[in-house]
């Protein structure tokens, strides 16, 4: 409680009361006017409201932006942490996004991945939310974090032999050609460039694709 004693009567122009040196975690309350009259007590109430935030996290593929192969940006589990304490968990939707509920602004909020979505490697990065109270002036605030992940990759190796049916001896087939493509694409021509490959077997009957994103080929 703050009181002002022996204040001169305001007359037609009221006094203005403002809060100064408000703690940074609070919204600065609006100024109020206060007329001062003879032998009357004028009362004004100020309420300190904590600044709050929500954060929208958007996950994308580190190389392409959108999901590659049969990998998915949906289903990744992230945690929001206060210091080193896990406060809540959230799961990415089909767009690789989630939005948190409101929390009190502070400088030690972070986002961390707990479980990656299908076809992606776990991201070990600790992402600062950007919820420092000095960044905001109002009660309800929104911030955003973009996070990226690396898709799993692998290759396919083939060894081709022939058997003339008489000797029963398998012979490496030099020059055998194979088209490899992501099954869900439907055909070789429909597959993305990084989701298909052509291999030609060498003199040992061996052929190997380039590294391709997670999926069934």
Say what each PLM segment does.
Residues 1-217:
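Solvent-exposed loop/turn and edge beta-strand elements of beta-rich ligand-binding domains
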């Amino acid at each position: 409680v703050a009181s002002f004693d022996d204040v001169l009567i305001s007359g037609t122009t009221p006094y203005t009361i403002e809060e100064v040196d408000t703690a940074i975690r609070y919204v600065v309350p609006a100024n109020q006017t206060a007329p001062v009259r003879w032998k009357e007590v004028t009362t004004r109430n100020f309420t300190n409201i904590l600044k709050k935030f929500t954060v929208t996290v958007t996950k994308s593929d580190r190389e392409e932006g959108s999901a590659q192969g049969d990998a998915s940006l949906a289903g990744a589990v992230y945690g929001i942490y206060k210091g080193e304490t896990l406060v809540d968990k959230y799961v990415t939707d089909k767009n690789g996004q989630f939005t948190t509920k409101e929390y009190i602004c502070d400088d030690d909020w972070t986002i961390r991945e707990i479980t990656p979505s299908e076809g992606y490697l776990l991201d070990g990065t600790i992402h600062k939310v950007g919820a420092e109270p000095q960044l905001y002036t109002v009660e309800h605030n929104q911030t955003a974090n973009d996070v990226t992940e690396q898709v799993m990759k692998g290759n396919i190796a083939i060894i081709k032999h022939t058997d003339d049916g008489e000797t029963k001896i398998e012979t490496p087939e030099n020059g055998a050609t194979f088209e490899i493509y992501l099954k869900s694409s439907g055909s070789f021509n429909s597959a993305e460039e990084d989701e298909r490959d052509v291999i030609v077997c060498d003199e040992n009957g061996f052929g190997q694709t380039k590294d391709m994103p997670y999926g069934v080929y």
